[in-house]
UniProtKB/Swiss-Prot annotation:
GO cellular component: cytoplasm
Major localization class: cytoplasm
Short name of any one Pfam family annotated for the protein: Phe_tRNA-synt_N
Cofactor note: Binds 2 magnesium ions per tetramer.
Record SUPFAM superfamilies: Class II aaRS and biotin synthetases, tRNA-binding arm
Enzyme Commission number, as recorded: 6.1.1.20
Protein name according to UniProt: Phenylalanine--tRNA ligase alpha subunit
Gene3D superfamilies linked to this entry: Bira Bifunctional Protein, Domain 2 (3.30.930.10)
Molecular-function GO terms, alphabetical: ATP binding; magnesium ion binding; phenylalanine-tRNA ligase activity; tRNA binding
Subunit-level organization: Tetramer of two alpha and two beta subunits.
Biological source species: Burkholderia cenocepacia (strain ATCC BAA-245 / DSM 16553 / LMG 16656 / NCTC 13227 / J2315 / CF5610)
Keyword Protein biosynthesis: yes
List of residues binding Mg(2+): E258
Length: 337
C-alpha cells in the first residue's frame, strides 16, 4: 500500500472518530500489532540493505505523521469533553444568592425569656444552679426529710456519685433548690425566679422525663398571700397579653409551703373560654424552709410558686402534645419562627 495513502487514511479515520474508544480502535488499524504500518516494518527484513534503509526511513516519517494526527485528535476530543463539562457545570454569577436560612428561638425558650422579662420588670433576679443536686438541697431543705411521705410524690433519677454526707446524688426534680441556694447567699428582701431544666421519671402527652420549670420566691418581713395573688395574676395577664383572665386559688398540699394552693386560670373569651386550666402550684413558704435558708421564720415570711414552662407554652400557642417540643420536627418549629 502506498505510504501517502496510509497516512491520508489514518488522518481521515482519526478525524472522524467521535470519541476516545473509536479513536483507539482506529489507532489499532494503523499502529497496532497487525496495523498497516506495523506490517510494512515487518517486511523490511526481506529487502536488501540499501533498500531497507531507504524504505525504513520513509515508513518512519509516515509513522510520525500518523502519530501526530493521533495526538492532535486525542487532544481535540479531550478539549471537547472538558468544554462540555464546563458548560454543564456553569454558574450564572448574575443570579441572586440563595442566602442562609434564618434561625429562630425554640418556643419554650421564647417562653423562658418572656417570663424572665416580665418578672425582671418588677424587680425579680434570676437564679441559676446545678442540675445534679444533693439530697439535702433537693429534699431535706424543702421540708421533705428522709422517709417523709412527700418524697413518694416524685420518681427521681439518681446518678453515680455521693454528696458530702454520703447520700446519692440526683437530677433535680424541681428548681426550688436554686431558690434555697440563692437565699443562703443573699439577704432579704429576696425576690428571685429560678428557671431551668428538671427531671422526673414520667413520659406521656402531657409529661416528659425532662422538662423546664420556673419557680418564684419573695421573702421579706411583711409579705402576704395577697401579694402572691397580685404578682401571679399580673404575670398571667402580661404573659398571655389579655385582661380577660380569671384566677382562682384552690387549697392543696406541698411540703415546702403552708398554706398551699393550686393556681387555676380561665379565659373569658376564645376556644378555652369557661374552662379552668391548672397553671401553677404556690403557697406561703414553710417556716422550716425559711430556717433552712438561714433566715429567722419569726421575722421573715414569703411566698413561692412554680410553673412548667412547657405548660405555659402549650396554653399560649394552643399546643396539645408536650412531646412536640422535644421531637425537633422543623414543620412544627417553623410555626414559631
Amino acid at each position: 500500500m502506498d505510504l501517502d495513502q496510509i497516512v491520508a487514511d489514518a488522518q481521515q479515520s482519526f478525524e472522524q472518530a467521535a470519541d476516545i474508544t473509536t479513536l483507539e480502535n482506529e489507532k489499532a488499524r494503523f499502529l497496532g500489532k497487525s496495523g498497516a504500518l506495523t506490517e510494512l516494518l515487518k517486511g523490511l527484513g526481506k529487502l536488501d540493505p540499501e533498500a531497507r534503509k531507504t524504505e525504513g526511513a520513509r515508513i518512519n516519517v509516515a509513522k510520525q505523521q500518523v502519530e501526530a494526527a493521533l495526538t492532535a485528535r486525542r487532544q481535540a476530543l479531550a478539549d471537547a469533553l472538558l468544554n462540555q463539562r464546563l458548560t454543564a457545570e456553569a454558574i450564572d454569577v448574575t443570579l441572586p444568592g440563595r442566602g442562609a436560612g434564618a434561625g429562630s428561638l425554640h418556643p419554650v425558650m421564647r417562653t423562658w425569656e418572656r417570663v424572665e422579662q416580665i418578672f425582671g420588670s418588677i424587680g425579680f433576679d434570676v437564679a441559676d444552679g446545678p442540675e445534679i443536686e444533693t439530697d439535702w438541697y433537693n429534699f431535706t431543705s424543702l421540708n421533705s426529710p428522709e422517709n417523709h411521705p412527700a418524697r413518694s410524690m416524685q420518681d427521681t433519677f439518681y446518678v453515680e456519685g455521693k454528696d458530702a454526707d454520703g447520700r446519692q446524688l440526683l437530677l433535680r426534680t424541681h428548681t426550688s433548690p436554686m431558690q434555697v441556694r440563692y437565699a443562703r447567699m443573699n439577704r432579704p428582701p429576696i425576690k428571685v425566679i429560678a428557671p431551668g431544666r428538671t427531671y422526673r421519671v414520667d413520659s406521656d402527652a402531657t409529661h416528659s422525663p425532662m422538662f423546664n420549670q420556673v419557680e418564684g420566691l419573695w421573702i421579706d418581713e411583711n409579705i402576704s398571700f395577697a401579694d402572691l395573688k397580685g404578682v401571679y395574676t399580673d404575670f398571667l395577664k402580661k404573659f398571655f397579653e389579655r385582661d380577660d383572665i380569671l384566677v382562682r386559688f384552690r387549697p392543696s398540699y406541698f411540703p415546702f409551703t403552708e398554706p398551699s394552693a393550686e393556681i387555676d386560670m380561665m379565659f373569658e373569651q376564645g376556644k378555652n373560654a369557661g374552662k379552668w386550666l391548672e397553671i401553677s402550684g404556690s403557697g406561703q413558704v414553710h417556716p422550716t424552709v425559711i430556717r433552712n435558708m438561714g433566715l429567722d421564720p419569726e421575722r421573715y415570711i414569703g411566698f413561692a410558686f412554680g410553673s412548667g414552662l412547657e405548660r405555659l407554652t402549650m396554653l399560649r400557642y394552643g399546643v396539645q402534645d408536650l412531646r412536640l417540643f422535644f421531637e425537633n420536627d422543623l414543620r412544627f418549629l417553623r410555626q414559631f419562627a
